[in-house]
A protein has these predicted regions:
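N-terminal secretory signal peptides
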Residues: 1-9
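C-terminal segment of N-terminal export signals and the immediately downstream linker at the start
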Residues: 3-4, 24-48
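N-terminal export signals
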Residues: 9-31
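Extended glycan-interaction surfaces of carbohydrate-active proteins
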Residues: 44-84, 118-144, 191-236, 277-371, ...
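Short amphipathic alpha-helical coiled-coil/interface segments
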Residues: 54-57, 178, 265-283, 399
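Aromatic-rich carbohydrate-recognition surfaces in CAZymes
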Residues: 83-214, 239-242, 246, 301, ...
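Inter-helical turn/loop segments and adjacent helix faces that build the functional surface
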Residues: 161-172, 252-267, 386
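Aromatic- and glycine-enriched pocket-lining scaffold segments that form the walls
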Residues: 236-259, 269
Length: 448
């Protein structure tokens, strides 16, 4: 719509006399050529809402590309009520944005999606502390170090982006920074000596207002991610945090091989396999077909949450092994694809609907039951890998339909109705990316 408006405006200018007419024709031709170069996906039908929502999503992302005070390149902000980038999601959001480059019109003086994706990684590396700690967030007000807040490993997204863009500097920077980050986590988040990763506070996992963390502070004591609160049940061994480290080590092994560091690659592979086996041995409950936190008193924190999907997100289960195949079968049938648990009309709720801790009606910013855009954005990382493409297609159709109802981009929805929580402003980057990425995937468009 915007391109057509601009073209008509230029044609009206062309009606003027002389040199103005020539200039109008020139600009009009350039604009039309640009429109022809930009790809658009095949929408589900001829309803104009699809194209309207597509253009609105692109506009949201363009508007959320801004500079933060402590880094000199524009980044893609989380948007809405979140003026910054977070370690758990910012790098992945940048990576997904980069895959949409073919649909984003270049604007003179503005960074490309791939440049933005690079900045969404390099900002964290630039603000890494001397001891190896990466910031949990880089906001307009400050960089945050009061929790670790990780889900999709930054090593994995950096490796994917470096492969996509053939960026040797990014590869080398990421390998160094993520190696130091892994060392920091071993030093400060393995206080019980188990080899698994410990959670000290709610924000470590980014699961705000989840009953998983009932009674536990949001941040670490003194806003210091090295400190666990003086609570008898803390610290906890966390399957999702451990899976993040596993995925990071797999990526570090791949980066090391690409850099010709064969012995380091082999060590990363051994370390990855060690933590993978520990996750399955210590943090999986066959009785419930669920992954749980294990507290300092040896008790599972029995809240069936989307932690299960986060473990699968890093491909912790290896289907070539009979033991892992059995776990996946049970997790999928009893939990993730169970319409009483996680396979809601709009998947995946943050807590199983038949869990006593499921929270509904849905409050704002709730990982206690709401279906979150961040969870949806992560699903293509694991569902096709485990042979669930048809189910992913269904999930994607549900999401794009829900978003297109209002042409708004919000954090979370009710898993039973598909109605978004509208307490906060629209303009949430993950939801815009979900719409664009899912429409593209459903249309079978290429990644570039």
């Amino acid at each position: 719509m915007a391109r057509r408006w601009r073209r008509r405006s230029f044609l009206r200018l062309g009606a003027m006399a002389g040199a103005a007419a020539c200039m109008g024709r020139l600009i009009s031709g350039q604009t039309e050529a640009l429109a022809q170069r930009m790809k658009t996906p095949h929408f589900p039908d001829d309803n104009p809402k699809w194209a309207k929502t597509w253009e609105a999503a692109l506009a949201v992302l363009a508007g959320n590309v801004k500079r933060v005070p402590r880094y000199d390149q524009p980044v893609l902000l989380e948007g809405a009520v979140y003026p910054g980038i977070w370690l758990e999601c910012g790098p992945l959001e940048g990576l997904v944005y980069s895959t949409l480059s073919g649909f984003v019109a270049p604007v003179e003086g503005q960074p490309t999606p791939q440049q933005v994706a690079r900045a969404n990684h390099m900002a964290f590396f630039a603000l890494q502390r001397e001891d190896g700690q990466l910031p949990a967030s880089v906001k307009m007000t400050e960089a945050g170090y009061g929790q670790i807040q990780m889900v999709v490993p930054i090593a994995a997204t950096a490796w994917e982006l470096a492969q996509q863009t053939h960026d040797d500097e990014l590869l080398r920077t990421a390998y160094s920074a993520c190696s130091r980050w892994d060392a920091w986590l071993r030093r400060y988040r393995n206080t019980r000596g188990t080899g698994l990763v410990e959670g000290f506070c709610t924000y470590d996992t980014g699961m705000d207002n989840s009953m998983r963390w009932k009674g536990i502070p949001n941040r670490c004591p003194d806003a210091d991610a090295r400190k666990s609160p003086a609570i008898a049940s803390m610290p906890r061994l966390c399957p999702d945090l451990s899976a993040t480290v596993y995925g990071g080590r797999v990526a570090l092994a791949a980066m090391a091989r690409a850099l010709g560091k064969k012995s380091e690659a082999a060590q990363w592979e051994r370390d990855a396999e060690t933590i993978r086996r520990l996750i399955l041995d210590k943090l999986y409950s066959p009785e419930d077909a669920a992954f749980y936190d294990l507290d300092a008193q040896g008790q599972f924190v029995r809240v069936r949450s989307v932690v299960i999907a986060r473990v699968l997100g890093e491909h912790v289960l290896k289907l070539e092994h009979a033991h892992d195949r059995a776990i996946f079968h049970d997790v999928w049938e009893r939990q993730l694809h169970n319409p009483r648990a996680f396979w809601a009309p709009w998947p995946f709720p943050s807590v199983a609907m038949d869990d006593p801790q499921f929270v509904r009606p849905i409050p704002r910013n709730s990982w206690g039951g709401a279906t979150q855009a961040l969870t949806a954005l992560r699903t293509p990382r694991w569902m096709p890998h485990y042979g669930k493409q048809a189910e992913l297609d269904h999930l994607m159709r549900q999401w794009v339909e829900a978003i297109s109802r209002y042409t708004e981009f919000r954090q979370q929805m009710d898993p039973l109705t598909g109605d978004f929580t509208r307490a906060d402003a629209s303009g949430y980057s993950p939801a815009a990316l979900v719409y664009l990425d899912f429409v593209r995937r459903l249309a079978g468009a290429s990644l570039a």
